Structure formats: C-alpha cells, structure tokens
C-alpha cells in the first residue's frame, strides 16, 4: 500500500467499486479499501435490480444472475393477490443477483483497470487540513498508516461514518430508517420467475415483506419495518418468523442477515472540499422500495467522471465538484427519489383498508406502460376517497408535475 494516491475510495460495494474503476480507467492512481475481510460478504441486500437499469451500465454476466424476473405479485392485507404479468410489469422486471459474485466482479474490474485493493482495512480518521479532506488514517491488522489523496470518495454504505467524520451530517431519523431481516430459504414452493410483495400493518408496518427467487425452490424471504414501529416482540425478525411460519412451515433456512436501509431524502449536498459521497452513504437508496444497486452504480460512475475532470483541472474544491451533485439530482435518479419520497411519506400512513382498496383497484387496470408514476396516478383516478386523502397530503399535485 502506497502512502499517496490521486483517489482514495472508502468502501468496496457497487458504488465504491464503480467509482474506483472509472477513475482508474482514466489513468489516475486509486486505492479502494474495504473494512470487511472479503468483498461482497456478508450480503445485506434483497439482491434485486431492474433489467433496463442494469443494462444502462453493462450486460450482466450469467454468473451474476440467480434468477431472471418476469412478473411481480402484490398481496394485499386481506390476502388478495394482484398479478402483474410481463406485459404489465415491463419496467419492473429484472434480475435477482448473486451479490457476492457481482460485487467481487466489480472490484476485479477496478483492479483490472489499475486500482489497488485492500480488504480488512478501515478508514478510522480522515486527514483534515484547512477544512479539506486530504486522505485518511487506515488501520489494517492493527497497524495504522496515513494515506494521502487529492480526492476521497465516501462509499461506506448506510452507516457512512467517514462522511460524518469529515463534517457532513449523515444522521437518519429513526422513522426514516427501515430495519430489515432476511432469510435465504430453500425447500419452499415459489414461482421461480416472480417476485412477491406483501403489504399490511400487521405484516410489515411501514414496509413490506419480499420474496425474491434465487433458483429452484430457493429465495430471499425478507422484511422491512419502519424503525419507529419496532417494539419488543414486534421486531423485524419477529414479523418475519410469523410470516415464514404461516407461508413456509416446511422451508429450510440457510442464512440470516439483518441491517438497515435509509428511506429518507438524499443528503442536502453530496460533495465537500476534496470529498464526494456516493451510493447509500449519500442516502440515494429508493425511499419507496429501499433499492440501492442502480443508484450506487450511477453515482459511483458519475463521481468518477466529474472527479476526474476536477483532478485534471487541479481543483477539487466543493464548488469544482458541485456538477456531480447537480447532475444526479437533475437526472432520472434524482427525480425518482424526490417523487418516491413524497409517495412513501403518504403510503406509510395508510391503513389496511386503504391498502386493500389500492391492490384491488390496480388488479383491474390495464397499464400498457407500468411504472411507479403511472401506477400511482391510476390508483388516484380509481379511488375517489383515497384521492382526497392523497390530495390533502399534496401527493396529487406532486405527481401532476412529473
């Protein structure tokens, strides 16, 4: 490990790996550090990503894909199942990934482009001089080493300690942190090409249960619950255990993971002097679904593109890096995050009668272009009483602006 690089990337997830790859491909010296001993492990993700969004960056390798998803089912609190066939779910179909394989391949791409990689290496303290980040003190195997860099990328996930240590307020209110638990299960009767989502305040208050297939009779079965709704006996794992007991009593659990997903608005600013923040660290996971793979890839690559130009000009100040922040906010990603946050704020307050009405009404719709925006607009049109509630929350006028 050298003592000086053009770029230091803190975090080896998709955002950090794609940023490192982009910088390295442009000829800059890059060090990517990952605090865990292995890239991609442990997995803390449902592993789903939209097909069109993934293809924006590359054609997935076969070894990345656990299952190709052709349709989605949404199950209401009363048990009614709405099936979205491929012709309706076109914008929502995609892949369930093997994240361990996918993440490692992304880091290998970065290494192949010339980036140095160090695992089990923690950035424990940023080097701050005159209000600017100048690198970090890294701890590897109990040995501390100072590594200086002209530009640092904070890609350290939802915890995002590094950005906070650099003076960026990354605090997430409890009500805007989805607490999650997930089993990898086998021996369960599922549709291997359909995702399923269960909603309801007795099933997953402030969130939902998901079933993401990963092969024959195998799936990620997980839950997200609003952080402010967790109580003794009603933790995410408690809700999940009850769900599994009802639906998969003979299933076998292979793995358990737990973690958190921010469902808040993005950070007010994702750059500082010599610092760029990407992926979950920037709070760009989807506040409605919790998905974050696409956002990590997009912001990681964009950081590499904008940051490279700033380095070339010899100016990595906040102002020089601001095009990164402005570009992603003006993009499809930024607009979707804004819209979905407002939708989430309304939907977490709906009772089960409202949720039943929504799922039943959607099942009767003929949506030739199914996506979140069209879905919500059609729900409002089909449910006059619900439209009044959503209108009072300001959601209808927001949707009309998109």
Curated annotation (Swiss-Prot):
In Swiss-Prot or TrEMBL terms, this protein is called Digeranylgeranylglycerophospholipid reductase
Q: Which reaction does it catalyse?
A: a 2,3-bis-O-phytanyl-sn-glycerol 1-phospholipid + 8 oxidized 2[4Fe-4S]-[ferredoxin] = a 2,3-bis-O-(geranylgeranyl)-sn-glycerol 1-phospholipid + 8 reduced 2[4Fe-4S]-[ferredoxin] + 16 H(+); 2,3-bis-O-(phytanyl)-sn-glycerol 1-phosphate + 8 oxidized 2[4Fe-4S]-[ferredoxin] = 2,3-bis-O-(geranylgeranyl)-sn-glycerol 1-phosphate + 8 reduced 2[4Fe-4S]-[ferredoxin] + 16 H(+); a 2,3-bis-O-phytanyl-sn-glycerol 1-phospholipid + 8 A = a 2,3-bis-O-(geranylgeranyl)-sn-glycerol 1-phospholipid + 8 AH2; CDP-2,3-bis-O-(geranylgeranyl)-sn-glycerol + 8 AH2 = CDP-2,3-bis-O-(phytanyl)-sn-glycerol + 8 A
- State the organism of origin: Methanospirillum hungatei JF-1 (strain ATCC 27890 / DSM 864 / NBRC 100397 / JF-1)
The upper taxonomy is: Archaea, Methanobacteriati, Methanobacteriota, Stenosarchaea group, Methanomicrobia
Q: What's the cofactor?
A: FAD
**UniProt entry tagged with the keyword Lipid metabolism:** yes
Q: Which GO terms describe its cellular component?
A: membrane
Any one GO MF annotation of this record: geranylgeranyl reductase activity
Pathway of action: Membrane lipid metabolism; glycerophospholipid metabolism
In short, the EC number is 1.3.7.11
């Amino acid at each position: 490990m050298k003592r000086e690089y053009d770029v230091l990337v803190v975090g080896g997830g998709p955002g950090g790996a794609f940023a490192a790859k982009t910088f390295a491909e442009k000829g800059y010296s890059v060090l990517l550090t990952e605090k865990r001993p292995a890239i991609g492990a442990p997995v803390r993700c449902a592993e789903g990503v939209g097909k069109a969004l993934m293809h924006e960056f590359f054609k997935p390798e076969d070894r990345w894909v656990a299952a190709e998803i052709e349709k989605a089912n949404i199950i209401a609190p009363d048990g009614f199942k709405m099936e979205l066939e491929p012709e309706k779910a076109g914008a929502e179909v995609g892949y369930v990934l093997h994240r361990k394989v996918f993440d490692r391949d992304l880091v290998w791409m970065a290494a192949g482009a010339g980036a140095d990689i160090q695992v089990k290496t923690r950035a424990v303290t940023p080097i701050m001089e005159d209000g600017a980040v100048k690198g970090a003190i890294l701890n590897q195997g109990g040995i501390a080493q100072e590594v200086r860099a002209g530009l640092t990328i904070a890609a350290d996930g939802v915890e995002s300690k590094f950005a906070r240590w650099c003076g960026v307020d990354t605090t997430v209110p409890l009500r805007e942190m989805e607490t999650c638990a997930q089993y990898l299960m086998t021996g369960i009767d599922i549709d291997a090409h359909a995702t399923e989502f269960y909603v309801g305040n007795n099933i997953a208050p402030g969130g939902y249960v998901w079933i993401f297939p990963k092969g024959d009779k195998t799936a990620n079965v997980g839950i997200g619950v609003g952080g402010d709704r967790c109580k003794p006996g009603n933790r995410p794992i408690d809700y999940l255990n009850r769900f599994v007991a009802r639906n998969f009593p003979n299933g076998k659990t292979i793995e358990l993971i737990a973690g958190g997903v921010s469902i808040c608005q993005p950070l007010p600013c994702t750059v500082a002097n010599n610092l760029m923040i990407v992926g979950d660290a920037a709070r760009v996971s989807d506040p409605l679904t919790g998905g974050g793979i696409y956002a990590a890839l997009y912001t990681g690559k964009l950081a590499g593109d904008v940051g490279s130009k700033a380095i070339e000009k010899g100016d990595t100040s906040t102002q020089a890096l601001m095009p990164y922040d402005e570009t992603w906010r003006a993009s499809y990603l930024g607009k979707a995050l804004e819209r979905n946050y407002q939708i989430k704020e309304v939907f977490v307050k709906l009772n089960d009668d409202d949720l039943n009405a929504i799922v039943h009404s959607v099942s009767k719709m003929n949506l030739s272009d199914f996506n979140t925006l069209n879905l919500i607009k059609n729900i409002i049109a089909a449910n006059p009483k619900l439209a009044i509630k959503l209108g009072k929350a300001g959601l209808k006028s927001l949707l009309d602006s998109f």
